[in-house]
Curated annotation (Swiss-Prot):
It comes from Paracoccus denitrificans (strain Pd 1222). One of its GO terms (molecular function) is large ribosomal subunit rRNA binding. Part of the 50S ribosomal subunit. Forms a cluster with proteins L3 and L19. In the 70S ribosome, L14 and L19 interact and together make contacts with the 16S rRNA in bridges B5 and B8. CDD domains: Ribosomal_uL14. This is Large ribosomal subunit protein uL14. The keyword Ribonucleoprotein applies. Belongs to the universal ribosomal protein uL14 family. Pfam families: Ribosomal_L14.
């Protein structure tokens, strides 16, 4: 469950290390985002010579949350930390690699590029 002011790890090699959610997209008063939702983030920490810089405002998709995600078959999955992947204006990932596992729910939301780059899909 991601809301405004939530800090997230970045799970790709775009150059950002930590981002902060500044808006949850999808509705005028939408408060929370879960796995597969698109948020607007501000880059708080970045590596030198990366594709994104500190202070950049970008869109990102949430790929891991500490709050469990309940599935239709009754199982649930949760992670230790919240993580996101930075997107460009076309909705494609900025980075060329994804670090750590991602959840199967991204497939239903048509993030196939992230699914194919991820080392593990849970």
């Amino acid at each position: 469950m991601i809301q405004m002011q939530t800090n997230l790890d970045v799970a790709d090699n775009s150059g950002a290390r930590r981002v902060q959610c500044i808006k949850v997209l999808g509705g005028s008063h939408r408060r929370y985002a879960s796995v597969g939702d698109i948020i607007v983030v501000s880059v708080k920490e970045a590596i030198p010579r990366g594709r994104v810089k500190k202070g950049d405002v970008r869109k990102a998709v949430v790929v891991r949350t500490a709050k469990e995600v309940k599935r239709e078959d009754g199982t649930s999955i949760r992670f230790d930390r919240n993580a996101a992947v930075i997107l460009n204006n076309q909705g494609e990932p900025v980075g060329t690699r994804i670090f750590g596992p991602v959840v199967r729910e991204l497939r239903a939301k048509n993030f196939m590029k992230i699914i194919s780059l991820a080392p593990e899909v849970l």
